[in-house]
Amino acid sequence: MGTFSVRHLDLFYGDFQALKNISIQLPERQITALIGPSGCGKSTFLKTLNRMNDLVPSCHIEGQVLLDEQDIYSSKFNLNQLRKRVGMVFQQPNPFAMSIYDNVAYGPRTHGIRDKKQLDALVEKSLKGAAIWEEVKDDLKKSAMSLSGGQQQRLCIARALAVEPDILLMDEPTSALDPISTLKIEDLIQQLKKDYTIIIVTHNMQQASRISDKTAFFLTGEICEFGDTVDVFTNPKDQRTEDYISGRFG
């Protein structure tokens, strides 16, 4: 399983309301793209799905974020389990300053796996899942910092996969990459949806239209429109959506 249901979510930074009455169902094993102009709330919303906003002292939320019908903001919800089930890939590749192997093994070790055979199998499976195994299999002891930007981002995806999550959150994962590396990541994302629910923030509307099944358009902290990507881009119901995707603003 791996389905998020968000109900009447409001998020505040002090007195400033960054998200307003967000209600959305994010379907399992599909790619949902979050689009909208800078400052519209899409990255803030993404971070509510694994409670990264907890790190901001002035932040508080109202409403519910349900993962398979369990409220992740409930005091009874296990935060470590949330981090295991919901992986995160950031805009800038952020490998740890350690070997390729240790980058991928880091998460499983944190969750208590120490057996070398089990770790070896997880590392290989994760690197294969991130479509980078063939490029690094003979250099697993090499520093991750020596990889190219595109390889580092795929390594970060492998690191997220290694804890065997149900859901992957991606915050503009290709914005710092060249076009060839971007294409590899896009192909990889489409392969990953067979096994994972994927929610991706992107400023690149062409990317959203290429790879996603569903699209949510954010504006000033609200969702103006959510639906099948083909419908949002070819027959939007909200004039603001049409204005944005046609380039009239943003």
Curated annotation (Swiss-Prot):
Name used for this protein in its record: Phosphate import ATP-binding protein PstB 3
Q: A single GO BP annotation from the record?
A: phosphate ion transmembrane transport
Molecular-function GO terms, alphabetical: ATP binding; ATP hydrolysis activity; ATPase-coupled phosphate ion transmembrane transporter activity
GO CC list: plasma membrane
Where does the ABC transporter domain start and stop, copy by copy? 4-245
Q: What class of enzyme is it?
A: translocase
List residues binding ATP: G36, P37, S38, G39, C40, G41, K42, S43
Q: Where are the transmembrane segments?
A: none
Its localization reads: Cell membrane
